[in-house]
Amino acid sequence: MGLAGYYRRFVPNFSSIAKPLTRLLEKGVPFVWSGDCEVSYQSLKSKLVDAPILALPESGKRFTVYTDASRIGLGCVLMQEGRVIAYGSRQLRKHEGNYPTHDLELAAVVFALKSWRHYLYGEACDIFTDHKSLKYIFTQKELN
């Protein structure tokens, strides 16, 4: 998983696809290669050999960040003028599985901003999420 994980930013939904394989690497879990593992392996293999269509970021142009969260993981896409710059995803940590939905959605936003801070620092960007309660946070000038 190490080398495949290195390319995770170029594979959309990497963490969801790789979940059956990463479960095999958990401590105390017997290594049993199931049908889900085979499907996951073949899917990752095909996605890693296909060249992703990514664009280089252009300075001075506005970035757009799309985020989403589920009970499995966090995902995000960085775009500029409708072109994909990068993908990001990760599986939830054990304690994050207990988070309420609005916290998971906010965690996806934080994950995206941390992952792409080198692109976004000092730049204007639009952030899109599918959770309406986060709209309040983004419209406040000051948060306590």
Specify the residue positions occupied by each region the protein language model found.
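Secondary-structure transition/capping motifs at alpha-helix termini
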Residues: M79-V84, H95, S115-A124
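Short secondary-structure junction motifs
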Residues: G60, G73, G122-A124
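Two-metal-ion RNase H-like nuclease active-site motif
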Residues: R62-A69
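Mobile genetic element proteins and their domesticated derivatives, centered on retroelements
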Residues: G2, L21, L44, D68, ...
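A short, polar/acidic, helix/strand-boundary loop motif
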Residues: Q80-A107, K132-E142
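C-terminal reverse transcriptase regions that engage the nucleic-acid substrate
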Residues: M1-K61, S133
